[in-house]
């Protein structure tokens, strides 16, 4: 099932990254899940699948990239895509994303993958235990690629390091 969804997502974007329009060296793009987090009900909802080049995908999982010794390269990509000349801008953004991640990791989350129904997948009958209550794992901390830093979020609650921006418009 995942292989089919991956290929479909890649094909829809003509095998280009939805954030930077780039392609990877070994394979063009990877499939990434976009989640909406409700911090009041602690519900994590799958809202979309997107195609990301391997570098943008590593930015989304910068904690894992750091563990793998790729932090500097990934931070440089984050800065390049967002046109941030100051390393301190990227560091502040990453620090804030980790703060939000750490706060969210203190809670148990209900996982809503009903999005998959549109592909003929019934989450209730899946063999793997995807639906239910989960805990976020700090090593896998996702982080977004944002447009230029002058694009404001509506409020602190609206800041979500887990969503992404396409063409300077926030996509949930």
Feature map (PLM): residue ranges:
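Short, charged surface segments at domain edges that flank catalytic/cofactor-binding sites
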Residues: 1-16, 21, 40-43
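A residue-identity detector for tryptophan
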Residues: 2, 27, 33-35, 84, ...
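A broad "ordered helical/assembly scaffold" signature
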Residues: 4-5, 33-42, 118-119, 132
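Residue-level signal for functionally critical sites in structured catalytic/ligand-binding pockets
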Residues: 6, 12-13, 30-32, 83
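Residue-level marker of positions within ordered structural domains that often coincide
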Residues: 14, 22, 58, 83
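Histidine-centered nuclease catalytic patch
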Residues: 18-51, 60-68, 72
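A detector for short metal-coordination/catalytic motifs
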Residues: 47, 59-172
